[in-house]
Amino acid sequence: MSTSFKEIRVSMATTEDIRRWSYGVVKKPETINYRTLKPEKDGLFGEQIFGPTRDWECGCGKYKRSRYRGVVCERCGVEVTQSSVRRERMGHIELAAPVTHIWYFKGVPSRLGYLLDIAPKDLDKVIYFAAYMVVSLDEEGRKEDLQDLENELRLDIKQLRDACDASIASAVSELERTITELQDAKTSASRINKVRSEAENKMANIRREYDDKIEHLERVWDSFKALKVGGLYAEDDVFRDVQDRYGDYFDACMGAEAIKRRLEDFDLQKTAQELGVQIVECRGQRKVRAIKRLRVVNSFITSKANPACMVLDVIPVIPPELRPMVQLDAGRFAASDLNDLYRRVINRNNRLKRLLDLGAPRIIVNNEKRMLQEAVDALFDNGRRGRPVSGTNNRTLKSLSDMLKGKSGRFRQNLLGKRVDYSGRSVIVVGPTLQLHQCGLPKLMALELFKPFIVKRLLDLALAPNIRSARRMIERGDPAVWDMLDAVIKARPVLLNRAPTLHRLGIQAFEPQLVEGKAIQLHPLVCAAFNADFDGDQMAVHLPLSLEAQAEARVLMLASNNILNPSDGRPVTLPSHDMIIGLYHLTTVKPSAKGAGRAFSSVAEAIMAKDRGDLSISAPVKILFSNIVLDGKTLDSAVVETTLGRAIFNEALPDGHPYINELVDKQVISSIINNLAEVYSKVEVANTLDKIKSVGFHWATRSGVTVAISDVVSPPEKQEIISKYETQARGVQQDFEIGLLTDLERRQALVSIWSEATDRVAEAMRKCFPDDNTINTMVTSGARGNWLQVRNIAGMRGLVANPKGETIPRPIISSYREGLSVTEYFISTHGARKGLVDTALKTADSGYLTRRLVDVAQDVVVRERDCGFTRGVRMPVTFRGDDGELHKVENAEHSVYGRTLAEDVKTPDDNLIAKAGEDISGIMIDSFIAAGVESVEVRSVLTCRSKVGVCSACYGRSLATGARVDIGDAVGIVAAQSIGEPGTQLTMRTFHSGGSASAVDITQGLPRVQELFEARTPRAAAPIAEADGTVSIEDGDRARRLILKSDNNEEFSYTVLKRAQLRVKDGSRVSLGDQLVEGSLDPKEVLRVKGIRAVQEYLVNGVQQVYRSQGVPIHNKHIEVIVRQMLRKVTVVDHGDTSMLPGELIDQSRYQELNREAQAEGRKTASARQEVTGITKASLATESWLSAASFQETTRVLTQAVISGRRDPLIGLKENVIIGNLIPAGTGLSVYRDVEPEPRPEAISRMYPTRRPEIENLLEGDSVDPEFDFSSLTQGLELPDDYPVQ
């Protein structure tokens, strides 16, 4: 399949674009008429705009049927077309006033704020009509007229002063006249003084009033002189007067209109140049802000987007089928929240239009404009600003942004995970008789799944004249239908899936076998891969349809081809439970059993003796074998002292396999199957596994293993052991009470005493269990349970932890067999409940970790055979022990196994063992150890130089197949699944070493893995030496200071907690990178001080440490794939003469490419420093905006992508799934895509063994003669006697 495009670009829609895409203007807020149930004209569901509600029928019914296709009804204005256009056609709302898009001004960071250099708070004031913004200013006119205007102002001030003087003079003459009159009237002095005082107050008020007016004029003048474009001014008397007096020189407005006018006049190129100069000249915060602003400005320049598009004059109305209205019972309706939000916008918009037409006062109009802005904000992103808009029951309405983001958003709900046809679901039951590649499919389910294929076959073989008849035959359950079903399913694999699908083995292909009943039958050996059991689990069945899909299912996904676990390369289809019991019983030796000491000439003879009842399968006997492998040698014949049971077991193993003459428990069977997988073909291994399974079940049935209460044997000496340790514990308590011990020492002593007591009881208990005890058999063989569980049941419960994770120093002495006291029961359940809560939390945390890992590694696909970079990393194979001998490095099979050698491996005396380019197998590791090789240089994904993905040579073997990884293998996804799948097994706790706050808390388990993959700085991170030198220690009151004096006299100081355990002493000599204190390191510091290789090792080893502590095997290369993704970015330090910006986080390959271009053109190159980014940050910083948007922070990613006109090169898997392309992995790669599979003639003849030339001719014709005799075609078909021939 060839795609029509290679990349996707997202950019801003202009007003013209929206009008061009739209099919009409939505003018009314109405949805449908509740009487007629038809959409209202010009409303949110209008048929004139969005298309008809019925196929090929206009709104009024004048035009019906498809012959009127494309006709627009002159009566109702509806176009005659399919109703499906209501999913595609959009309308628009013409706004009465412009509004700002909330994503651009309320996002973090505010793009509008950076562009216009306005603080978000000030921007908010302008947009929501709380302040004016100056949008244009005639600076030249102001400059020219400034003197005249000032003279005019001075004249006004002079006039005010003259008026003031005149008013005061008038008041004085009035006062003198009044006093004269009062004196003439012989009024008292007090009265005259009162009149004088009042007059003076009046004159003071006059003076104050005129002074205020003058001061006001001065303020108006100062404000006018200080006016600048972009300046913000509150709506007060001063600014109103500035507008009245000097309104000809400037223009100021409020709301989105002000922003729009600023953006229309905004010069991007000029601003970019000014900011470039600022970056060079400025320092500190000004430089940082200039860089951030330039980043936004450059985004607009590169995308050629018009910034004015951030302000909207029209709003798109999405198709009505995407915001449906559904009729419920009792005549009520349920509608999408978007309809309510659109209705609010339309109502406010119509009201604003009416107010503008009426010429309403400005304050009322501004208030309505603000409400319109808020309504549009709620439509685009409800709750981003202010209180979210709520509907009925106080529920927040879902906006357009909410439709995209989150688990139930468009990306994750509909684009990345779709429901599929040809699928079913049922409960699973065990199918012990199935082969490894088979599953049991219920007949009824198969009939429904394969219905179209059965119909086709019935038509092909002329057993039904048409599709309707064929369907009726299937519904009736005609006998011929079952024959057709048998024939159809023969060559068709089905896929079985069990949720949760934590790794690739959660979906496997099987050949279906028809079974009665309604439950799917599952092979017992694949249960481990699916993590399935038969306590009510359900599984889904899917049907691969195309020939390519069937071929892939058969070759890549068939259960018998998926024997190895992709996480560590070990077999996952291991016998367990009953099978182990059976094999253990079969290979047990009982010296006194019947027939012991006899000799037989063959296994057959021994079996005959057993059938006669003369020989037990457990009796030690001598048997003559032919063609047997013993001690690595193949012998023509040999007499082996063994048991008949062991001989029967060895018959299940393939020819040429060494004879297993030992008791077969879980460990032995595991090593046998490991060896089989390494040496034999998959077909042979699958056959052997089936034989072992059958033998195991057969002899498990005959072993008669049962459990009774009498099998639980308690040690008789338990009380004696307990009383001895009780005395010791009492002594410790007394020492504490008289003050000889601290509380911490007491707790530690008691824990130590009771741990020893528990071990002694467990030891005594194991001795009490006889060899033939069934519980003993189960535990010893590895079939079920362990000695710790048996100790709880039969010995003593022992020490338990409280919910904080601390050990309670008083043990539970009773066992479950004896029964717990009330106190013991309470203490026991206290910690146990915490365990259950932890498990629930762990599952969610682990799932989220897997999701982040998948997201960061999803585009790591093998793209080429060899990147050509031959240097690798050195890995140890052996180490020299205290005895001076070489020993194999623990976990070598999880570090060097399956890798490609980067250089020849030679013995110390220069003999060649392995050549560069060879893959390291288990056998090769053994040869390295035998030859005394200490370390080897291997290729690694950490050093791979492939531009996209990784190369096959650097990755090495695929652990799932045991062969070199193929081009197209999605190794990133496999790595993420391998790390994430066992996540639930990891513990949640932060453990305390000692008492609750005695030492530094050590983060372990899942939180530690998250801490490492997110490259977080740990709490109380341990410092590392930044140079070679000597350490001195200074003790303070609360903390210690470590002072490192380097060899070149530099001094470094580190402050550490008083309780931290030091790794150095005063005067110790340290080397660069040495850890000075116990605890976790900060990966960023490791990178800074020791370099990239050290941080790679630290992260890989840190993650492995957590998984190994829980006994979870994972190969290093999976962790390396994730670490490679974490180290892909660099931070630009000096941008030189390139288009990069200082402080910019950029992909390493892109950085090198831009530097090469600069070098070729003779420009100054940039310099950068390596960064270690956490997986979340790395996922969001990916080249693909589609992948990042579907991961997290959808609105932020989309906003940035739109502004910068981001192009998605469609390299990763997620982005191709989203747009419906084949994924660029496996057979989806162009290398394999052009292959056209066709069935061979022999395959067709095998599918249709009874097809004859007459049928071929009949099928090629266009029509069938009604007189044609179909019975002639059924001659020779094997049909049941009672089958009616039509």
UniProtKB/Swiss-Prot annotation:
Q: Which cofactors?
A: Mg(2+); Zn(2+)
**Family matches, as InterPro entries:** DNA-dir_RpoC_beta_prime (IPR045867), DNA-dir_RpoC_beta_prime_bact (IPR012754), RNA_pol_asu (IPR000722), RNA_pol_N (IPR006592), RNA_pol_Rpb1_1 (IPR007080), RNA_pol_Rpb1_3 (IPR007066), RNA_pol_Rpb1_3_sf (IPR042102), RNA_pol_Rpb1_4 (IPR007083)
* Residues binding Zn(2+) 1, per UniProt: 58, 60, 73, 76
Tell me one GO biological process term.
Answer: DNA-templated transcription
Residues binding Zn(2+) 2 are 867, 944, 951, 954
Which UniProt keywords are listed? DNA-directed RNA polymerase, Magnesium, Metal-binding, Nucleotidyltransferase, Transcription, Transferase, Zinc
- Quote the record's binding site residues for Mg(2+): 533, 535, 537
Instruction: Quote the CDD domains the UniProt record gives.
Output: RNAP_beta'_C, RNAP_beta'_N
Q: How is the cofactor bound?
A: Binds 1 Mg(2+) ion per subunit.
> Which reactions appear under catalytic activity for this entry?
RNA(n) + a ribonucleoside 5'-triphosphate = RNA(n+1) + diphosphate
What's the top EC group for this one? transferase
- One Gene Ontology term, aspect cellular component: DNA-directed RNA polymerase complex
- This protein's source sits in the domain of life called Bacteria
Give the Enzyme Commission number: 2.7.7.6
A GO molecular-function term, please?
A: magnesium ion binding
What the entry lists under NCBIfam families is as follows: PRK14906.1 (NF011498), rpoC_TIGR (TIGR02386)
Q: How does this protein assemble? A: The RNAP catalytic core consists of 2 alpha, 1 beta, 1 beta' and 1 omega subunit. When a sigma factor is associated with the core the holoenzyme is formed, which can initiate transcription.
User: Family per UniProt?
Assistant: Belongs to the RNA polymerase beta' chain family.
Briefly state the protein's biological role. Answer: DNA-dependent RNA polymerase catalyzes the transcription of DNA into RNA using the four ribonucleoside triphosphates as substrates.
What's the name of the protein? DNA-directed RNA polymerase subunit beta'
Q: Output the lineage of the source organism.
A: Bacteria, Bacillati, Actinomycetota, Actinomycetes, Micrococcales
